[in-house]
Amino acid sequence: MQFKTIVAAFATVAAVQAANVSTNGSNRTNGSNTTSTKISTGAAASNALGAGVFGAAVAAGVAFLF
């Protein structure tokens, strides 16, 4: 049981870090773009974060199957 918890926690951390990297990349481009691009890029960053959370949930579910 402890091994499953460790695997699930590691998968969650990895997914969150991946989401943070994609969000940070979008924020870096926001500094030099126009306001209209910031809005669309913000939506893309929000979608990336949502995908990261969903990926973490899937990874945790798969880890508990084993």
Swiss-Prot record:
Keyword Chaperone: no
Membrane topology of the entry: Lipid-anchor; GPI-anchor
UniProt main location, coarse: membrane
Propeptide section residues: 43-66
UniProt key word Transferase: no
Record keywords: Cell membrane, Glycoprotein, GPI-anchor, Lipoprotein, Membrane, Signal
GO CC list: endoplasmic reticulum; plasma membrane; side of membrane
TM region positions: none
Coiled-coil ranges (or none): none
Glycosylation sites: 20, 24, 27, 30, 33
Lipidation (GPI-anchor amidated glycine): 42
Leader peptide range in chain numbering: 1-18
Location relative to the cell: Cell membrane
Name of the protein described by the UniProt record: Uncharacterized protein YDR524C-B
Organism: Saccharomyces cerevisiae (strain ATCC 204508 / S288c)
